[in-house]
């Protein structure tokens, strides 16, 4: 049964006023009486809408600089009153039923994100009356509609029109779920903020919690259910953070192809985050979360051609990311040359999409252009817990490198070293990357021994007929022994970039000097597990 409830009276009190005037106009035009508070009431009155201030309705003024506005029995009685059960007591106390509550909360997250935000500023942006009304209306969803998202305004008006001025129980229940999600996320933000400011409460520690709150509350919104997870016997879904601004796989728009799989999303994230490191036209090809070919070029077609040559076998069924618009010529080269699961780029031309559309299994995503990376947190689930760390946004420039060998790198070796250092950051540890002329020529990933990663990189280069002589090699972490340098020298590497920091650095540097290799220390590690 639909259990419709007519909407005759609505209380509107919003911080984010986007769309509220139009929504209020639509409600008023349908005979809905409007109650409102503070700035919302003033805005509606300025637009010529008939609106009753809550203070006039309750007979009690706003007080304490607006801290107390709606905390009154005539407001909450009107929201919580059960139709058909509490009518007599509502009439006795002159409480009018409120059929719809439209509320969004003080911008706490935006406030504390501002540079120089004080604790006092944060406290004043903790909404009290708003969440109370939201929870009251959500609790009484059998009779009251609670609206916390402006994106629902149009659909609500359409349903009111389709149901002779009423909303169905199904809609009210869905709105109530959104309301509880909204207040849960809001309280989580406050708890995280305050939790990061207090001393640790376990044991005798007096240290401040610092970057990480003592209780971590996370809020993610389900974007899609999936056919299965990493393997077919695992169920899965994709959740995204709310209000993410940075271009990412989470914010990307799929413009073509069938639904993304769990592994598609994970691999696309790896490819996109890697290609973001480059300012020049770049292409990254990823397979099983590891780059198998990366290059920069004069155009994305040139970059793709060079990236593909690194490892054509692994590129089959891979993910391809670009940092420029996907054009028709590049799209044609991809489709003609290989099977690809996903292509992601800031944008795609109409001509390119016509070409990729010929292959129904090709998924095309556009993510928009990106600017500066946004600091955030990375999570790794372990059984019974969660590891949390800052995103690895670290990178070094030429001026920060230390040459620790007798021989200085040539200009080309230095360029290649910086190039493959960027790539190594996105290769699973132990990671070794060989590069020459701004393209990868061999990648050794995920080996338990660093020397074997170095050997694999050399084998891959040899298999594809790519000349290693004169190339640069990047290692994501220090060399514990000289054997990795010996393997690189045997392959033809002439420049090495690595963090340094081993107790055997002297031995490793001596090996480089023996082979005439230039070695650069970054003093920064990029483990990736």
Curated annotation (Swiss-Prot):
One of its GO terms (biological process) is 'de novo' IMP biosynthetic process. The modification N6-acetyllysine is found at residue 287. Residues 1-148 form the MGS-like domain. Keywords: Acetylation, Hydrolase, Multifunctional enzyme, Purine biosynthesis, Transferase. SUPFAM superfamilies: Cytidine deaminase-like, Methylglyoxal synthase-like. Belongs to the PurH family. This is Bifunctional purine biosynthesis protein PurH. It comes from Escherichia coli O7:K1 (strain IAI39 / ExPEC). The gene is purH.
């Amino acid at each position: 049964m639909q259990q419709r409830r007519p909407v005759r009276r609505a209380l509107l009190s919003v911080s984010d006023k986007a769309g509220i005037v139009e929504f209020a106009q639509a409600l008023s035009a349908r005979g809905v009486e409007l109650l409102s508070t503070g700035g919302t009431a003033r805005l509606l009155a300025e637009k010529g809408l008939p609106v009753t201030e809550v203070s006039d309705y309750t007979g009690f003024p706003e007080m304490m600089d607006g801290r107390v506005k709606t905390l009154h029995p005539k407001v909450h009685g009107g929201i919580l009153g059960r139709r058909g059960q509490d009518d007599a007591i509502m009439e006795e106390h002159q409480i009018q039923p409120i059929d719809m509550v439209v509320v969004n909360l003080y911008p706490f997250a935006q406030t504390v994100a501002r540079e120089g935000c004080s604790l006092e500023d944060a406290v004043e942006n903790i909404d009290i009356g708003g969440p109370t009304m939201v929870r009251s209306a959500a609790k009484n969803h059998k009779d009251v509609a609670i609206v916390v998202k402006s994106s629902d305004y149009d659909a609500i008006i359409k349903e009111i029109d389709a149901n002779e001025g009423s909303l169905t129980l199904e809609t009210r229940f869905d709105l109530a779920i959104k309301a509880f999600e909204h207040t849960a996320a809001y309280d989580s933000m406050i708890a995280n903020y305050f939790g990061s400011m207090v001393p640790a409460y376990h044991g005798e520690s007096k240290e401040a919690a610092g970057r990480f709150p003592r209780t971590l509350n996370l809020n993610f919104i389900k974007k899609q259910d999936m056919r299965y997870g990493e393997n077919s016997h695992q169920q899965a879904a994709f959740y995204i953070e709310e209000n993410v601004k940075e271009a990412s796989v989470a914010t990307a728009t799929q413009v073509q192809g069938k639904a993304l799989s769990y592994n598609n999303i994970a691999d696309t994230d790896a490819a996109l985050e890697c290609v973001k490191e480059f300012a020049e036209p770049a292409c990254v090809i990823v397979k099983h979360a590891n780059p198998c070919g990366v290059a920069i070029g004069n155009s994305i077609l040139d970059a793709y051609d060079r990236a593909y040559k690194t490892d054509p076998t692994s590129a089959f069924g891979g993910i391809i990311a670009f940092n420029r618009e996907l054009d028709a010529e590049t799209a044609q080269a991809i489709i003609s040359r290989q099977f690809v699961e996903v292509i992601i780029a800031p944008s795609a031309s109409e001509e390119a999409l016509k070409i990729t559309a010929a292959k129904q299994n090709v998924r095309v995503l556009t993510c928009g252009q990106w600017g500066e990376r946004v600091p955030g947190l990375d999570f790794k689930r372990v059984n019974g817990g969660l590891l949390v760390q800052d995103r690895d946004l670290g990178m070094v420039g030429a001026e920060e490198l230390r040459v620790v060998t007798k021989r200085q790198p040539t200009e080309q070796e230095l360029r290649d070293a910086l190039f493959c250092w960027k790539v190594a950051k996105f290769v699973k540890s132990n990671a070794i990357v060989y590069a020459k002329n701004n393209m990868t020529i061999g990648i050794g990933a995920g080996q338990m021994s660093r020397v074997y990663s170095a050997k694999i990189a050399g084998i891959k280069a040899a298999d594809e007929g790519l000349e290693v002589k004169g190339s640069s090699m990047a290692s994501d972490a220090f060399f514990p022994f000289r054997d990795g340098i010996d393997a690189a020298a045997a392959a033809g590497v002439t420049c090495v970039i690595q963090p340094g920091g081993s107790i055997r650095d002297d031995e490793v540097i001596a090996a480089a000097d023996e082979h005439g290799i230039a070695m650069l220390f970054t003093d920064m590690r990029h483990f990736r597990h």
